[in-house]
């Protein structure tokens, strides 16, 4: 069985700075990391290897220059996948969910798969669209919000979803796309042995042309800025007489 687990490289929020001049966010010094939600998908895929005979897990990502980072590749492979496929092209730097899903679907078809796992959303945008779009593009079942995988056979995956007032159990025919929630597991921290072994695992680097992808730019430039900080006036009203109460009420009306 071939299991693909998709992931996205996102900026490390600890490295994002705010420009004091205009309040815009500066990502120039932010290192890339695996989206937190995709760590759950990677962990789930590797746990499924224990349920499926001769299962192989392939990590897959599409993106820009962040995917060229050797440290980032090793981080992914140290978490259990048997191999890594990255599709690198400048046009993926600002791809919208539709373009990302189209590229992932094309890459998955080229690689071959029985099951595709991904996180419910990404740590940076959390659009919660890509997984379902991949299923739609491939014309296969797609389920999101999965909080537990019960069993896996050669042709069926049984999962649970936590709804508002009940737990839903679904049997999904394969091939399929499943987007998992953070409730599904707690991603393990790779051991030193796993980190060293990651360097020996195969990595395939594809271009957009390799998967037959050539989309026109479909994004719009928007400003991302920190909220404006309002300077406190530090008005202190001393006393509890009628004049002080009236002054307090007047100042309160100014900010409501």
UniProtKB/Swiss-Prot annotation:
GO molecular function, one term: electron transfer activity
Pfam families (alphabetical): ETF
GO BP terms, alphabetized: carnitine metabolic process
Database matches in InterPro entries: ET-Flavoprotein_bsu_CS (IPR000049), ETF_a/b_N (IPR014730), ETF_b (IPR012255), ETF_beta_N (IPR033948), FixA (IPR023463), Rossmann-like_a/b/a_fold (IPR014729)
Record bears the keyword Electron transport: yes
Biological pathway: Amine and polyamine metabolism; carnitine metabolism
Record key words, sorted: Electron transport, Transport
Job of this protein: Required for anaerobic carnitine reduction. May bring reductant to CaiA.
Quaternary structure and interacting proteins, as annotated: Heterodimer of FixA and FixB.
Classification via HAMAP family: FixA (MF_01055)
Protein name as catalogued: Protein FixA
Organism: Escherichia coli O17:K52:H18 (strain UMN026 / ExPEC)
């Amino acid at each position: 069985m071939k299991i693909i687990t998709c992931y996205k490289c996102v900026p490390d929020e600890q490295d994002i700075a705010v420009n004091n001049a205009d309040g815009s966010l500066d990502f120039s010094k932010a290192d890339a990391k695996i989206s937190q939600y995709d760590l759950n998908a990677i962990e789930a895929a590797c746990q499924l290897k224990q349920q499926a005979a001769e299962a192989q897990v392939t990590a897959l990502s599409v993106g820009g220059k962040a995917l060229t980072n050797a440290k980032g590749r090793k981080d992914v492979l140290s978490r259990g996948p048997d191999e890594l496929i990255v599709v690198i092209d400048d046009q993926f730097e600002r791809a919208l969910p539709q373009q990302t899903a189209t590229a992932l679907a094309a890459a998955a078809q080229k690689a071959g798969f029985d099951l595709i796992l991904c996180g419910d959303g990404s740590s940076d945008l959390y659009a919660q669209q890509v997984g379902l779009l991949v299923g739609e593009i491939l014309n296969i079942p797609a389920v999101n919000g999965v909080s537990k995988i019960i069993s896996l056979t050669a042709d069926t995956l049984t999962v649970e979803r936590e709804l508002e007032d009940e737990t839903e159990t679904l049997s999904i025919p394969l091939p399929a796309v499943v987007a998992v929630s953070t409730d599904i597991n707690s991603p393990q921290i790779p051991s030193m042995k796993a980190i060293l072994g990651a360097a020996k695992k195969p990595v395939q680097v594809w271009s957009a042309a390799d998967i037959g992808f050539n989309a026109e730019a479909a994004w719009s430039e928007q400003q991302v800025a920190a909220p404006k900080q309002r300077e406190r006036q530090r008005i202190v009203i001393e006393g509890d007489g009628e004049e002080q109460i009236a002054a307090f009420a007047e100042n309160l009306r100014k900010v409501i």
